[in-house]
């Protein structure tokens, strides 16, 4: 055995994945190639005397020096065949004493036999020195960024001090005004206005303290990240050659995996805590709403007046087989186009990453925030009144103004040159991200549409594979870049830097033109301006369009300055984006390129309308029992839409939270400007039924309440006086019992008020449909005049609903022959069974051409119906090639779970539809049924042959001629006979494999992986991970774990406080939980009420970010280091993570915080001040009244002194006299003066106070000589 050892780690084949095994084989072949070449070079030179060759137990060659009795791995002939130093190396050569080795878990590493050490870095590359220089440059830039944050902290602190002083001045003015409020001649200010100003100033101080606390947290976060980076640099420099050996690399890797497991478990705890916070927040909201208005219904019980009766008919049910298959093919084409668009957007985003350096946007944001803080401070100084200031204060304020103006000018000149281009790139990136999000929404809608076809056929598509191997599952043997540094919770919600810069520029341009406006007057002017905007004109008061009943706006050329309105998801063909408040329907089908229709939100319209009506004193509280309107009146007008959109416009899966009390049309009629649209004219004749639904989970009972009906005369005219009407309901299908209301003779507005309980389990309920029929009874004769069909699949068992439903007249219900299976469902069953039979026979080999042609007719039909394989082949081919790096080796576990789920769904569908296939085949007509090759087809008429020939002269495939509906022209009927159905269905350029007779079914050949390329000599073009990379990854994991534990602790504390508040029904904490924006953003991340489509969209966005990272890595030239990824690594440590809001000081007992303690003292001072002020006002009023009655001043003073014998409580000194006051400003006096004339006589003399005893800081108050009382 050689005594010169190397740290060789044994591989574990059972932990390796196929790509790693292939990479290991390539590395082994490369090493064998080097050994063979080395042996060929050494064969020219014999071994020196006394040397011998031997092999170790693992087959590795070592050399024996018999003279010195030593063994070594080095060949003594290397001194003749290898270069001596790195400068002498050419190409991939290593100098003498160096060896390249490979470990399956770590990868390539290098052995220095001369120094008897191992290292991860390639000694031939200088990537490590480049990394160290980049780290040093970033630390200097981060130091500048930290200085900006500290300067921002100083400016914010100055704003806080000036705001506190202004608050104290207003408090003093309010105290003076309160003492002389009884006489209007003595008061210089309105007491109510001063009191409002005082509240505004106090809120401003409180807000500035919160902002100061946030900046403090940002500074501490940045300092911690910089300290971590400094420690990493020092740790690497302390190592020998700045490199870790293989044993240390293995230990670091194992530690990272352990930390990752802790992160996974901690994230589960955090998600559970956030879900608990969502529930507590909802409970607090319910308590507050119930306390404020117990008569109104809870907003969580949504009221919907959307039409549940599809008057236009469901497209999926009315389309025949051919139209449905054409619709599915069109959807597939749209899906393919959107996928190409997504790939294009991803590529553009990958290009934009190189333009914007990581961390530069954060630095620009800090610069702009600093400028904005200085502008706000300048505006605060400009708004300060200088009348009551001393000369020293005026001089300090003017100097501060001049300095701020100079700083702002310099900052704008510097930022306009360097920040403008970066912000333009950032704005372009944001636009691309918005487009990508809209494209993902559209792709998701199309996937749902394709899944709806899968319920009738065997086509299935997985959301996990929709974008091609975008797996979130991490590798079991290594952590990738995306696993460590791409974390949605590791980054706080971003700030729109572009908008921030625009606002800062507007402030800078306007601060000189703006005059100081009194806060109270400014608020009053705003209120007057808002009230003046509401005109008494009936048209302007509603702020509506003509016709007022239709919220649809046709906007072919929208103004770029106005925000674009989003489209209804039903018309996703023109513009794909569904509104954020709706659950996207599964139909963005038709590919008609119609003009875009911008639809206003119905909920938004009603809220704005209600608010304006309340201002006009026309609004009435919402009442569910009000006269019902047509639900379609809340929908857009259907008459202006293209015919292709009509099939989707009337039935959507969304139920809007809209009241039925007031409509746009009714209000417009009241205002005198009634312009009804064409779509509203026939709706007044609709018959409606009000039905309430509620499910009791504990009892397993569905409560059906048949309340009332409206305008049933539109369905049937009573022919006799004794005619009555009743409602009958049943859960279909397979309903054993039905429920029935009492019979009434009122056909206009009958009130039934009947409630029934139907025992049924929840899983069965969601598969049922509630059918309510309107039945008339004349004597012994009964007749069904209308029907309401309600799908329980859309019913939310968590909510109780009370809705109006349109009744479809029985005259419009067509009568069909009693078939065992509808044609569309039968066609779907045929597709399912055919696909299942083809899947079960996938192992069977094809015997001959004749047998294939025999079954080609039926298989052609099934292929035209729903062949999913082409799309799946396209998805498989569009997956990016793996480059062998560790972050491209993720297991797609989520995709496998989705596929297993879909397989189970398809299997259930096959079992249900298999028994119906025979019935369908008997009822279906077949034009051609011969078992030979059929070359007949349906030809076009003679008059259209020329036009058809001009349009398309492509040859017709043989398999297309078997479809009876495939009408072609005889002039271009060129039948191309392929061997089988699978070949004809396959595009000529899709399959890279040649024909193999006797192989398995060739349809699966399209999914074979590409043949492995011949293994050639591998060049060192891959930049491996260095020791600095490993240390940064480890510290990043530790940082994430530290902040995760901190978040969990804060969330746990917040949960406990909110739980106690919920149990005690504390209104203050409930108001904070509802109004705090930071808390609302926090719970919005884990709100279970968020629709599943939004959660899936967030997952897709996360996967797309990882895909963009992979695309960007492919743009890095081979052999060049990835500079952007390394910059992202080091900027990760200074990015602020998700912040957990902290409760105010009055709700909790946190550690000592000087800012919060000062706030508490101010509150106590204010309470004492108000008590003393009330006492003084009462005494002052009595004194003035007695002075008017008695002219004798001496008797008056004696009586008042006897009356005011109890001394009022003394007022402590306000905190403005603390060292927090700005330099050069005198502390404001706490002694209020009654009038300017008495200021000289009524003064406060401060008592010398001991600094160690804060209780001695009191003022002695003298007696006012005019009124004879203490003030």
UniProtKB/Swiss-Prot annotation:
GO terms for biological process: border follicle cell migration; negative regulation of glial cell proliferation; negative regulation of organ growth; positive regulation of apoptotic process; positive regulation of hippo signaling; R8 cell development; R8 cell fate specification; regulation of DNA-templated transcription. Keywords: Cell membrane, Coiled coil, Cytoplasm, Membrane, Phosphoprotein, Repeat, Transcription, Transcription regulation. SMART domains: C2 (SM00239), WW (SM00456). Residues 878-897, 1154-1169 have a biased composition (Acidic residues). Residues 685-805 form the C2 domain. It is found in: Cytoplasm; Apical cell membrane. GO terms for molecular function: kinase binding; molecular adaptor activity. Residues 1-51, 518-566, 838-899, 1143-1169, 1201-1265 are annotated as: Disordered. Residues 45-78, 92-125 form the WW domain. The keyword Translocase does not apply. Residues 18-43, 522-543, 850-862, 1218-1249 have a biased composition (Low complexity). Residues 192-223, 326-454, 1039-1066 form a coiled coil. The keyword Cell membrane applies. SUPFAM superfamilies: C2 domain (Calcium/lipid-binding domain, CaLB) (SSF49562), WW domain (SSF51045). One of its GO terms (cellular component) is cytoplasmic side of apical plasma membrane. Residues 1206-1217 have a biased composition (Pro residues). It comes from the Eukaryota. Forms a complex with Mer and Ex. Interacts (via domain WW 1) with Ex (via RXPPXY motif). Interacts with Mer, Sav, Hpo and Wts. Regulator of the Hippo/SWH (Sav/Wts/Hpo) signaling pathway, a signaling pathway that plays a pivotal role in organ size control and tumor suppression by restricting proliferation and promoting apoptosis. The core of this pathway is composed of a kinase cascade wherein Hippo (Hpo), in complex with its regulatory protein Salvador (Sav), phosphorylates and activates Warts (Wts) in complex with its regulatory protein Mats, which in turn phosphorylates and inactivates the Yorkie (Yki) oncoprotein. Kibra acts synergistically along with Ex and Mer to regulate the Hippo signaling pathway. Belongs to the WWC family. KIBRA subfamily. This is Protein kibra. It comes from Drosophila ananassae (Fruit fly).
């Amino acid at each position: 055995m050689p005594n010169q050892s190397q740290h060789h780690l044994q591989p574990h084949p059972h932990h390796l994945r196929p790509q790693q095994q292939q990479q290991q084989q390539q590395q082994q072949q490369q090493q064998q190639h080097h050994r063979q070449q080395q042996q060929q070079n050494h064969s020219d030179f014999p071994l020196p005397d006394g040397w011998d060759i031997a092999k170790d137990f693992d087959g590795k060659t070592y050399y024996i020096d018999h003279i010195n009795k030593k063994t070594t791995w080095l060949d003594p002939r290397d001194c003749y065949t290898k270069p001596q130093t790195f400068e002498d190396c050419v190409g991939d050569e290593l100098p003498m004493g160096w060896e390249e080795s490979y470990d399956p878990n770590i990868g390539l590493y290098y052995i220095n036999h001369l120094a008897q050490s191992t290292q991860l870095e390639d000694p031939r590359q200088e990537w490590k020195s480049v990394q160290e220089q980049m780290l040093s440059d970033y630390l200097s830039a981060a130091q500048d960024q930290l200085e900006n944050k500290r300067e921002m902290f100083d400016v914010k602190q100055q704003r806080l001090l000036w705001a506190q002083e202004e608050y104290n001045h207003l408090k003093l003015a309010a105290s003076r005004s309160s003492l002389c409020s009884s006489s209007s001649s003595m008061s210089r200010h309105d007491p109510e206005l001063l009191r409002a100003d005082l509240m505004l100033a106090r809120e401003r101080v409180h807000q500035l303290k919160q902002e100061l606390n946030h900046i403090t947290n940002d500074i501490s976060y940045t300092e911690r990240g910089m300290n971590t980076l400094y420690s990493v640099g020092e740790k690497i420099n302390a190592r020998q050659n700045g490199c870790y050996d293989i044993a240390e690399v293995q230990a670091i890797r194992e530690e990272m995996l352990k930390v990752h497991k802790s992160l996974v478990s901690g994230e589960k705890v955090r998600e559970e805590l956030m879900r608990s916070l969502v529930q507590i927040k909802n409970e607090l909201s319910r308590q507050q709403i119930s306390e404020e208005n117990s008569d109104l219904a809870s907003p969580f019980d949504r009221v919907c007046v959307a039409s549940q009766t599809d008057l236009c008919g469901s497209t999926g049910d009315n389309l025949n087989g051919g139209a449905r298959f054409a619709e599915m093919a069109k959807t597939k084409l749209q899906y393919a186009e959107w996928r190409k668009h997504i790939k294009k957007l991803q590529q553009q985003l990958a290009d934009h990453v190189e333009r914007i350096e990581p961390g530069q946007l954060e630095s620009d944001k800090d610069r702009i925030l600093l400028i904005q803080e200085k502008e706000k401070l300048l505006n605060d100084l400009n708004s300060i009144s200088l009348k009551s200031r001393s000369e020293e204060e005026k001089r300090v304020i003017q100097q501060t103004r001049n300095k701020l103006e100079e700083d702002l000018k310099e900052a704008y000149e510097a930022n306009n040159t360097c920040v403008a281009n970066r912000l333009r790139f950032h704005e372009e990136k944001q636009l691309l991200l918005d487009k990508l999000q809209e494209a993902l929404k559209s792709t998701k809608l199309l996937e749902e549409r394709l899944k709806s076809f899968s319920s009738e056929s065997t086509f299935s598509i997985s959301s996990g594979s929709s974008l091609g191997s975008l797996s979130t599952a991490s590798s079991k043997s290594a952590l990738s870049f995306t696993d460590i540094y791409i974390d949605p919770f590791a980054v706080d919600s971003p700030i729109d830097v572009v908008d921030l810069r625009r606002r800062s520029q507007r402030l800078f341009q306007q601060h000189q033109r703006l005059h100081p406006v009194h806060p109270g007057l400014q608020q009053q002017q705003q209120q007057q301006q808002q009230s003046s905007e509401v005109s008494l004109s009936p048209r302007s008061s509603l702020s509506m369009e003509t016709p007022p009943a239709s919220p649809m706006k046709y906007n072919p050329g929208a103004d770029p300055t106005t925000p674009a309105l989003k489209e209804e998801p039903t018309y996703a063909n023109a513009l794909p984006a569904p509104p954020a408040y709706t659950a996207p329907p599964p139909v963005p089908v038709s590919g008609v390129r119609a003009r875009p229709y911008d639809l206003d939100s119905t909920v938004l319209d009603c809220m704005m309308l209600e608010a304006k009506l309340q201002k006009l004193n026309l609004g009435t509280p919402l009442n569910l029992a009000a006269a019902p309107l047509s639900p379609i009146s809340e929908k857009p007008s259907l008459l202006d839409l293209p015919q292709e959109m009509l099939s989707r416009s009337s039935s959507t899966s969304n139920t809007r939270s809209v009241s039925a009390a007031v409509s746009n049309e009714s209000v417009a009629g009241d205002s005198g400007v009634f312009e009804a649209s064409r779509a509203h004219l026939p709706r007044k004749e609709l018959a409606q039924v009000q039905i309430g639904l509620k499910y009791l989970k504990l009892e397993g009972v569905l409560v059906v309440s048949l309340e009332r009906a409206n305008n049933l005369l539109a369905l049937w005219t009573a022919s006799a006086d004794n005619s009555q009407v009743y409602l009958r309901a049943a859960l279909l299908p397979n309903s054993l019992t039905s429920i029935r209301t009492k019979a009434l003779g009122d056909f206009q507005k009958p009130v039934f008020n009947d409630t029934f309980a139907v025992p049924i389990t929840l899983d069965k309920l969601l598969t049922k449909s509630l059918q309510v029929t309107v039945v008339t009874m004349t004597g012994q004769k009964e007749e069904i005049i209308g029907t309401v069909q309600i799908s329980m699949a859309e019913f939310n068992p968590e909510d109780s609903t009370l809705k109006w439903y349109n009744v479809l007249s029985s005259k419009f219900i067509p009568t069909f022959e009693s078939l065992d299976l509808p044609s569309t469902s039968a066609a779907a069953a045929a597709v399912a069974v055919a696909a299942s039979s083809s899947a079960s026979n996938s192992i069977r080999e094809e015997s001959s051409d004749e047998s294939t042609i025999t079954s080609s007719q039926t298989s052609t039909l099934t292929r035209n119906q729903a062949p999913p394989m082409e799309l799946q082949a396209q998805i498989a081919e569009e997956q990016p090639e793996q480059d062998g790096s560790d972050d491209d080796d993720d297991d797609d576990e989520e995709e496998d779970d989705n596929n297993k789920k879909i397989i189970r769904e398809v299997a259930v569908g096959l079992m249900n539809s298999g028994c119906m296939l025979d019935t369908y085949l008997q009822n279906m007509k077949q034009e051609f049924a011969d078992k030979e090759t059929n070359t007949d087809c349906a030809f076009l008429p003679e008059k259209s042959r020329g036009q058809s020939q001009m349009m398309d002269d492509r040859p017709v495939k043989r398999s297309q001629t078997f479809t009876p509906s495939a009408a072609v022209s005889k002039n271009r009927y060129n039948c191309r006979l392929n061997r089988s159905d699978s070949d004809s269905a396959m595009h000529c350029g899709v399959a890279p494999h040649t024909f193999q007779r006797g192989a398995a079914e060739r349809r699966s050949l399209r999914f074979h992986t590409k043949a492995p390329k011949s293994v050639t000599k591998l060049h060192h073009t891959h930049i491996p991970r260095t020791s600095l990379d490993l240390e940064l990854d480890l510290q990043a994991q530790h940082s994430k774990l530290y902040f995760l534990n901190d978040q969990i602790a804060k969330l746990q504390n917040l949960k406990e406080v909110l739980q106690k508040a919920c149990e005690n029904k504390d209104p203050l904490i409930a108001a904070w939980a509802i109004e705090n924006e930071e808390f609302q953003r926090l719970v919005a991340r884990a709100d279970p009420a968020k629709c599943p489509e939004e959660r899936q969209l967030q997952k897709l966005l996360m996967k797309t970010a990882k895909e963009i990272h992979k695309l960007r890595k492919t743009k890095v030239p081979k052999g060049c280091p990835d500079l952007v990824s390394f910059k992202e690594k080091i900027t990760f440590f200074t990015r602020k993570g998700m912040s957990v809001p902290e409760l105010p000081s009055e709700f909790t007992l946190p550690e000592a915080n000087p800012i919060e303690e000062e706030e508490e003292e101010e509150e106590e001072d204010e309470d004492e001040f108000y008590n003393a002020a009330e006492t003084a006002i009462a005494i002052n009023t009595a004194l003035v009244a007695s002075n008017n009655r008695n002219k004798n001043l001496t008797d008056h003073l004696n009586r008042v002194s006897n009356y005011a014998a109890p001394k009022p409580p003394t007022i402590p000194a306000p905190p403005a006299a603390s060292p927090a006051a700005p330099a050069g400003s005198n502390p404001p006096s706490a002694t209020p003066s009654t009038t300017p004339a008495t200021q000289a006589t009524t003064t406060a003399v401060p008592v010398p106070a001991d600094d160690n005893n804060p209780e001695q800081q009191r003022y002695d108050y003298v007696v006012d000589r005019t009124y004879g009382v203490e003030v």
